[in-house]
């Protein structure tokens, strides 16, 4: 009987065992999902494991060889979470599997997640034109993002863990692109973007980060390419004062000669035209422009106030396209297309003034008496998506002529010439990139001596010729570190006019070698530091050599997603001085490299600011201080009569400081840009101790600019723009004579202000595109003499100036 009861008890235990195991499996979920309170803190992986075991009584089993137990991990934010969630956060960067062993044991299997390079190119879908500054974002299933921008060749690179990502690409004026990619090894992505309408639309200048873009990565003040004039938009940026077409602009209290213009990296000396309405370059051929001030990327040097990088189109690699433009100053044509489809393309543009053809129909006082033409040409060959070879040619000529011959025939009395040629090669091999270029640039200013000095004949000229070789390397280590270094060599020859009984030209050759190294370190997603140094050896063949060390520093911090704090420092040095004594640049003006005792001009620029990014815009406030050393000025009550410049010029120092604000906002069909700058620019000279610190010629205390546009229809818009600024300091009196010591830097021009209105119409007819622009400059206002010195006979009362432009692309 007793044995029967034992058998029955044994059978009941066997039947009940599966149920018991089922309860323990349920207990496994309970153990892994037990709640635990965690405070925000940092500890090693091993310390976190020990704390979990002590706090919960759970035994953790793991293979120490599979993970870095000494690696420091911070859990933030803290709070209530499950044990499983905490383990995944501790082992972020690992693929984690957790198995339960009763009664309270968790077996943790971890495998390090591999990371790979995701690289690619961003280009326009119809033309294969590479896009510089496109924002590329990779987003994983948890919403975590990795961001970068495409470089000057349209190439981008990101280092991300293996997995599936959504790739988002955005660029101003283009439809955003979204695609999915599975990353299991290094991969290459080609992104082709479609223009929203077509590329010859109105320009919007944005002073830094745009919606959903990278404040710490995007080039400062990037302007998208357009058929309009890019330079005419610079004046909307705070601290920038310029004429109608952006010529002769001043930046943060600096002079006209303190700004450098680069065309595809080639310096264009003394850019500009006789007509202040004519843009510096043919806008139909321009792809984009980047305007640097305050902080200068380490590879840049040569001027102390600003550097403007203008990049030309490479040409359509898929189909032949023609663009014809007729506006008030000039008529232009631009041709582009493939020579070898998807491989070799051409771009040729030419422009010429046309109102001068009607001079014979006008009275002598209303004639233009000048003509302008320029051309751009470019060949681009793609060996591969990341390897390109480009050839560039640029030329411009402005000619001012008068009927001086007895038979009434016109004689050229002033001519400006610019030339630039470049052969460049760029490639990318893994994380290492290289760009190498050879280029030649020249500027000549020629004048008829009979108009400069009585009883003389013939021509005199001044100029600069420059032959350069550059090579630039870049290296990216994951997403944390980016290095850039390079070497530049320049051989320059200056043609300088020597005045006296006879005018003659002397030649001064100069060798210059530059080396630079730049580091960008992203310490965290919120904090980045960029530090670099540029060294220059300036070696004239017949004069003293100079050596310069120019450090650069930029610190940026995002305290929140919508706010950016930044601190910038740049030391710059320029080895060229230029003083203009008339309304026009003449060969007899003071042009001098750092020879004959004229030391290089140097500057340190300090700036700190705050940017706030809104859903449909941004605002920015910054303060700056800039030093200026070895500045030159014409002595009071002085006329230049010969080549002894030391008798007429005095050397001093200066500084400038100010506060700047900028606002950009969109509301449905409305778009507003507003900028204001309060700045002071001072100079002091040892020869005038009694004057102390006086305003510089570039002191403009108050500068206010604004632009408001309204989208009337899908094809048309109306715009209203204006500026108000303090009058500039005078250096001549009302009779155009030099001021005395007592009046030196004491008088100003009146307050300048101007209101402009404009209308634009855009329409596509199949594959044909049309842009019409109409407007009036200075509807009301009091512009400066420089602004109205346009040499056009089409003026209304009060210096009101109409303009119009018609572009047709087919």
Which functions belong to the PLM regions below?
Residues 625-627, 649-734:
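Gram-negative outer-membrane beta-barrel transporters
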Residues 355-357, 387-466, 500-508, 586-587:
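Flexible loop and strand-edge segments within Gram-negative outer membrane beta-barrel domains
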Residues 460-472, 506-516, 599, 618-675, ...:
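Outer membrane beta-barrel strand-and-loop segments of large Gram-negative receptors
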Residues 629, 724-736, 754, 759-810:
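C-terminal beta-signal and adjacent terminal beta-strands/loops
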Residues 23-27, 49, 94, 101-141, ...:
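Short, acidic, small-residue-rich periplasmic hinge/interaction motif at the N-terminus
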Residues 91, 151, 175, 190, ...:
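Periplasmic N-terminal accessory/gating domains of Gram-negative outer-membrane beta-barrel systems
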Residues 139-155, 159:
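Short, acidic Ser/Thr/Gly-rich low-complexity loop/linker segments typical of extracellular
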Residues 236, 408-425, 563-564, 571-629, ...:
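Outer-membrane beta-barrel signature, preferentially recognizing the C-terminal barrel domain
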